Structures are given as structure tokens and as C-alpha cells.
Swiss-Prot record:
Glycans are attached at N877, N1009. InterPro entries: AB_hydrolase_fold, PGAP1-ab_dom-like, PGAP1/BST1, PGAP1_TMD. This is GPI inositol-deacylase. It is a multi-pass membrane protein. The gene is bst1. The chain crosses the membrane at residues 131-151, 797-817, 845-865, 897-917, 966-986, 1016-1036, 1053-1073, 1081-1101, 1102-1122. It is an enzyme of class 3 (hydrolase).
Amino acid sequence: MHRRSSGSPVEDDAEDSPLVSRSPTESTAHGPNNNAFETAEKSRSQIAKRGTSFDLRRDNGASTPRSRNSGLWRTPSSSSTSSTTAMATASTETKSSSASFLMPLASQRLPMGTSPESSRFRSSRLRSPWTCSILTALTTLVASVFLFFIVRSFSARQAGEDGCGIPVMSPTFLHMVGFDTEHTRFASKYNLYLYREEGVDFYNQENLGLNGAPVLFLPGNAGSYRQVRSLAAEASRHFHDVVRHDQERIKAGTRSLDFFMIDFNEDMAAFHGQTLLDQAEYVNEAIAYILSLYHDPKRSRRDPELPDPSSVILIGHSMGGIVARTALTMSNYQANSVNTIVTMSAPHAKPPVSFDSDIVHTYKQINDYWREAYSQTWANNNPLWHVTLISIAGGSRDTVVPSDYASISSLVPETHGFTVFTSSIPDVWIGVDHLSITWCDQFRKAIIKSLFDIIDVRRASQTKPRAERMRIFKKWYLTGLEPVAERTLSQKEPNTLLTLEDKSNSILPQGQRLILRELGHRSGPKVYLLPVPPQGVSGKKFTLLTDQRFDKTGEHGNLEVLFCSVFPLQNGKFATVFSMNMDFSGGNTGSTRLACKNAAEDGIHLPASTPASKYPFDRVQPFSYLQYELEDLSEHQFVAIVDKADSPTKGWVLAEFSDSSDAVIRVRGGLGGLLSAGLKMRLPANRPMLTEIKIPALHSSLLDYKLQIVRHNHDKRQELFAPLLRQSISDPHESKFFVNVDKVDVNLHGVAPFMPPPLREQATLGGVSFQLWTDPSCGSTVDVSLKVDIAGSLGELVMRYRTVFAAFPLLVVALVLRKQFQMYDETGYFITFAEGLDTALRSSFPILLLAMSLLASSLATSAQIPPSDEPFQWPVNATETPIDFTKNDLLLGSQDAFFWFLVPVFGLISVGVCVILNYIALILLSVLSFIYGCLRTRSGYIKRNEKGTPIFSAPTARRRMINTAILLVLVSTLIPYQFAYMVACIVQLATCVRAQWHAKETRSTAHYNFSNYAHSIFILMLWILPINILVLLVWAHNLVVHWFMPFSSHHNVLSIMPFILLVETMTSGAMIPRVTTRLKHVTSMILFAIAVYSAVYGVSYAYLLHHLANILAAWFVVIYFFSSGFSLRRLWLILEGDDATQGKSEPGGSHQKKKP
């Protein structure tokens, strides 16, 4: 006779253990008025006599006998009655001759001990899987409340208004059919196009009309090449309407932009590292082909005197920006073929998801290459020396890629690139979402104008030198208020001679503020002079704000601002020095001559703030603003404000020199104090026009705030402008403007979780800065208050911790499984998932959360964080202090110990999510089980033994082995192992459906054990499924586009074999054998390791969660195969087909009952 698993509902192989019949006594026990479980308890002595079992614990002579197959016992049928009697009376039965051939279906007897723990679980073994304890219910309720408010906060987050204009375009896409398989192996998968604006760009079939600098657009993850049409259309129209009519710019080398674009067939590079590398390889081949087109005079209309282009400007959206950076690291990259990269909403710092090992390792290789290149001391050793990288982020409106990931401060020094937000760009001042960043009208105009400014076709590189390009990009993309913003005043020579009569009263007293409420109130131009304070006075700053535009030299507007110094007359030769002479002396001989510089180029645009203003992006003329430190004006004695209006004109000017002691307020104190008490301050009536409030403690991107500004006793009719507020941080360059400010929602992209440290470690964090422009002439005080927005802050967790909600629940599942197996190995009862969760909540779960909370706090406060297990170390020069770019990969990824409480919060939410998923799975299984039962009873016959126990039908062992072998061969050759995992999940679902139906039909402990066990394994596999599903989507997409090249990195058979073997074994209904020796601790250790890893590394390296679960499955397979004395002989017999009768009933074993 053969042994079965403890509580296994499966029929043993026919040739080893034929189907058995029931004795009359046993049959009576299963009558309608008797409880099967009472029979099981009352007949334990008989059970011990009838069967044998395999026990992994040592035989110390004190083992408690355990039942073999719960209370529903079968006596082996045979042609000899004496044989049956002998087996029934035997106190100990040795293994049959075929026992060593048994497949992994070993069993143990259920214990008959009377320990409190055993009694407790014996009394609860009938507990329904739907049962939920009060503790679990309360935990789920609290978690649901948290989750509700988080989702609600995220949906109503502080994202700002959508104010993008709609672009106008007439697109035509020309397919570059010549770029075929002779040039690239990806010709059948990807395509290259050229954009032509209908009615603007010249082209025909013979001549493509290439006349400018080549630009290549790279779409993002699952993006379309047609997204470039708004940018390309603006480039064509701007050149046609503006640039071509400016002869000075034409002579300076400015030409049109020839926009090419790549059709990646909507490939999903964000989910698959190999796809990212394939796209980068194709980009380099496309660049080589594009440059070759300019050598063909039949396709180009370029001036033959101009050099042929040697480089291409790359513009990448989303993952297209990563592809652009990757292209420069590939072996087929032509040196210096790319020197300018502009990316939009590209996740440079970290991959959007870490579910694929290839994408994580590819990111590491790319970022390490860029960091190492810029760490070189000499330019000759830096292959990226001439490359500028500009990363533009959309801000809070982007819910696809966290804008924090767009930061390149950990990759590129400030001399070669920077990160900026669209809300900072002058005349844009708006946050955009992930898709609208490619077509937003205000933004596309800024992008195209900046590109035209860096073009110089007189150079082979088609662009100006790197330093000049960086200066232009800063001018176009930064507000001009940043510390790194450059001022051109000191670099210019005086070009205007200003002549004033000596007795002029236009010179204001030192320190007096200039206020003009109207321009042209006197006939003719008028000059106002503000004396520059003497050098050595610390903290002085000049500021000027007006609603007029600054005139450049020679223009005829209403206002011109000059910085002047006294110019002595030298024999009347001054006229040949200056290009502009402004004489206000009236012809008097006694006059003062000033040599002046025009400040228009340093003018800064600010959004107009009036009592009628609503948004900073309103289509109205912006304010003009000038700001200089006193050190910048060391060469000048006067600031001249020239009112050139001939007649009274509506307009105003406000200018002054202010002290930093009055204009700058630094708020001391930590984050805790600000959170508890908030911030309140009053600005006096005699304050400067610009007041700056710096709060270093506010630097986290996880917190939102409410800012309120209240003005007292102010007269709107006398007010020159309404209060204007700028919120800013320095790294990355993020500024937000608020007009007509009253109440403000404040959120920022400062210090974010999991972000690598910058290349140059900052001594202190600058925090957030608020710059407030108010009209000081009103004589009113201003109250400023700031407090934390708790409800708004909850929504920030979604974007920053999205992957946490996939990793932390696996911690809960691992602890539940650990508790289930501990109780199973001790008592023989496999408790339900809900009961295991309740037990974990009362024991290991709080302890683990406490440990993780302490770890999170210590990681954030530790000055030297140990490097992670992943070898992500960037080699640096021996003389430099190495930077660990992975130090923020652990746990919460937070650099602030204040947020330690997020660990228990996420743990609490994970419990609720697991409970919800458990009940969703139970509902699904119940529905499918009901359908399964209906289909089974409609077959006409019901297979039942005499006691009414349905047979758990299963395929033969040989068939299971063949199925497994076929699937593994396919994995090693054609399909990725992720597809096999999905198949395993489906098979496990079917096993759970059958197990639940049998458990309901038989109401036996054996079937309940297996049903609970199969259900818990299914829950574990469900949490692993999202890690595999993304790569599976990439593979399926490749099949759709007829790309059949297999993934070289996803055919590791060992990555899926344990899961396949485990699932195939469970299809037979085999309950996993109990482990009662010290080896049972191996199960606990593996599950505990999965729980800890899920919390510590699960966000940054989520792909390893699959492999850890795979190790657990391998351990379960080992328990299955070797607990029953598995031998190669049994395997050979199965391959020979000796199991042909397995699962078939014999006449004496069961009968077939006709369906009524």
C-alpha cells in the first residue's frame, strides 16, 4: 500500500494503490445525519493502525501518531479478503515494493496530541476562509480609510491649471524608404521619417528640400513618431515667418531645422532593457544615414560653400530621452555625431519601474558611463565633453513619470546641462502633463526659439560651441532670477552717450525709491537718475519692475534703462565711440555726459499681476524686471530710467536699491516645528518692493503646504500691481509663479525618495524660497502664513511610492505563508489565509514593522550609509571621495528621518490591500467553483466512492512531465519565462477552483488543508504576476509587429522551472508534506527573507522578488520530491508509460452513480 500526503485528496496511482471501497461502518459515518469530522476524531486509533506515513522529523520514540488522510479513510480493495483483514489489523505497515517509485505525494498522519496549540487549531480547522477576525477587520478598515484619502488626495492634487494653447499645423511625413536592411537590421521593425510642413516647406519626389540643421525626434514608451508634428510645424513656420527675414541671423549661420523622426512602432522600452538597447542601436544607424543625405545634392538644397553636417540634434520625449543618452554609449556611435540633447519628461535618474532586470542594469551602465565621462580631469579623456543635455520636466501634472526622475544633477555637471520645469520657462509658466509637453503651444515656441539661437551651419557641428549653447539655454529656460543666471551688463561696452544739463533735477537723493505712476506726463522724454550706492555697502540690491517693455538701443518704445558712468570729453571725439547719442541738455554748454550701457538684454519677464489676473499664463503682456547685485554695478555711478513717451501713457515704473537685511528673511527651525506650529510673519509697511523668505527646512517633495497672504488697509485703486509670488528651489530649477496672490497651494520637487545624490554634494540644502513682489507705496502691512496641507500631502505618496504598493504587500503575504507553514508543520492543519494573517498581525508583523521603522530612521540619519548589495558602485579617482549613488535605494529611499512613520503606514495599507485581494480571489474562486460543479454534474455520471467523496481527478504523472518538458523547451527557445509564469498562474487558478469545490463537497480536513494551501500559493503568485506581466506585454507587442527575434535575457529555464514543477505537482491534488525536523526552519527563513527584501529592496530592485519566490517554489519542490523517497527508477517507469492506469477506478474501488 502507498502513502499519501497529509490530508491529500488525491487518488494514488492505480498501479501502486488501487481505488478502495469503504466499510459499512465508514459509509454509515458519512450519512446525512452524521458529521464526517466527528468520525475522523473518533477513529484516530483505527487510523494509526491502518496506514503508514513519511515523517521528516527524527524518530525519538515519542512521536505522536498522525492520521494519514484525515477522517475519510479508504481500505485498499483486492481480490483477497484476507489481505484486507491483514492490512487493517497491522499496527505498523512497511512500504510496498513500489513505494520508492512514488511521485511527490508523500503524506503525514495528523497528530493526536492534546497540546493547547494543537487543540486550538483542531478546533479552528473548520474555520471558513471567509472568516475575518476583529483585529483583521479593524486593520482593513483603517487601511481602507488611508487608501481612500490617498487616492482622493491624488485625484484632487495640487497640480495646477491646464492652460496650454492649441497648436496649428499641416503635417506631412515622408518615409525614408532608402533606410532599409542594407543600413540596419531593424528595418522591418522601425522606420525613419522626415517632416515637411505643407505649404511652407519645399520638397518633391526628387528633392527632399534639406536646407538646414538636422534634428531627430525620438518618441517615448509606446509613443508615436507623429508627436513631433507640433514642434516641427512651429520650426517651419517660425523660420518662414521670422528668421529668414532677419539677415543678421542668416549671416550668423541660422538656418531652418530639418526634423526627422523615428517610428519605434510604439515599442515599450520602459519595461524592457533589451528593447532600449535595440532602439539606441537603431538611432545611431539613423544618424549616420541622415548625415549621408546632406552629401547628396539631389536631396539637399544647401549652400555648397557650407560644410556638410557632422552632428544631429536629438530631442527625446519620455523614454526617447533615455534612448538618446544610451545611443552615445553604444559601440556603433560615431564620435561627435551628437552634441545637443533636449529631453522632455524623461526619467534620467531611475527607471520608471524596476520589474525587469535588464532595464535596471541598462540604466546603471548608462548612468555610470555618463558619470565616469564627466569625472575626467582632461577634456580629451571625456567623450561627452562637447555634449549639452537639457532635461525639461512637466511638474505635478505629469502622472506617468515622476518629475523628480527628470533630474540630471547626479549625471551631468552644471557646465554641461541642467534640469528645468516648464513652470519656470519665461512666457510659459505652466505645468504640463506627460503627453501635452510635446504639443503645448507656449512651450513648443520656447523650445524652437532656443534651438534656432544655437544653430550655426557655418560649423560642421551645425551648432555653436558648448559654452555658448549653455548660455543660450539658460537664457531661454531659466527665469533669470537663479544664482547661476548670467548677466551681460559687465561684458558689454558702453554704446550710448547720455547728455544732461548740469542743473537738471532728475537725480534722486541717495536711497530714495523711484515711483512713476504714469509715463509721458511731461512733454518730451524725461530722464531719472538713481545714484548707485558706493561699493563696500554689503547686501545692497537694485530692483526695477514695470509693466512696459525695455527698449534696446535704437528702439522707439516708452522706456529704456541705462547704467551709466561719467564720460569726460576728449577733444570732441566722443561721437565716434557711441552708436547712440541721447541729448537732454537742450543745447546748453554746461552739461554732463554719461557713458551708458543698455540693460534690455538682462531684462526678466515676470507674469503680469493685476487685480484682474487669474493665472500666470494669461495671454497678456508680461511685466519687465531688472535685478542686480551691487557688485555687478561696480563700474557705474548712475541708473538712468528714460521715459521716452511723448504724451501721457498708461504705465508705471518702480525702482529702488534695497538692503538684504530688510529684503531677505531666513526662517530658522526644523521641519517638526514648522509642521506643528506653522509659520506666521508680518511684513512692515516700509518694506522693499521684493521680499524673499527662505525656509531651508522645507525641501521634501512629500509635503504640500498652504500659503496665505493678507494685506491690511490697502487701496486697490492706488496699487500699481497686485502681489506677485515666486516659489522656487535651486536643484532642480523649479519655479512657480502666482499672480494676484491670496491663497496658494505649495508643492515642490525637492528632495525626493530613491533619488541618487548629485555629482557635487551640497554642503547644505537650500530648501524652498518665496519671493514676494508687493507695491510698497500703498503703506499697508502684509501677513504671511504657511501651514502643512496634510490632505494634499497624502496624494504625493502615489507618485513617489507607486512601486511600494506592489512590494510591501508581498511582505504581508510572505509573513502569512510563514505562519501558515509553521502551524501546519506543528499541528498538521493548514490554516486559512485570513487566519494566518490574523496570527501574523498578533506576532511577527508588528515586530518586523518596528524593525523596519528603526532601520529607515537610521539610514536617513546615518552619515555613511553602507553600500547596497547590488554592485552599483561608480569607480572614481583615488583622490576623490567616492559617491554611493545607490545609498537612497534602501527601504523608503528617504534622506529625512522625519518620514520613518511611512513604514508602518505602508505596512498597514498593505494589510488592507492583501485582505481585499484575498476576498476578491475568494469571490472569483467561488464563482468558478460553482461553474465547475455545474459542469461536472451535467456530465451524466458522478464519480464518487461509497462514502460520497468526489475523486480529485488529475492527469497522469507521465502527462504532467511531458507538459512540463514541452513548456521548458519553449521557454529556452521561443517564449520568455514570463509567459510560462502566466500559464502557471492560470493552472494554479484551475487547481484552486477544483480544490475549493472538493473541500465544499467533502468537508474533510484533508481537502480543506489542500484548498487553503493552494489558495495561499495562488495569492503569492498573484503578487508576483505584475513583475512579469510588463515584459510579457513587450513580447506580445513584438509578435503583433511581426518581430520574432527572441529575448536573449528572458530564456533562463531556471527562472521558471521551480514554479512549473510546483504548479504541475499541485494539479494532482498533492498536499505538501509536513517538515518536522530542523529543516522546517528553512521554509521560515526563505519566507522571512522575502518579507525583509520586499521592504528593503522591493522598490528599487523589484525584479528580484520573482527570483526569491522562485527559490521558495524550488524548496517546496524539494520537499515534495525527496520526502517520499523519490528515485530515478520511478522516473524511468513513468517515461516508459507504466502509469497508464493512474487515476482510473477499478470495479471494487468505486462505483459510478447515474445522475438523477
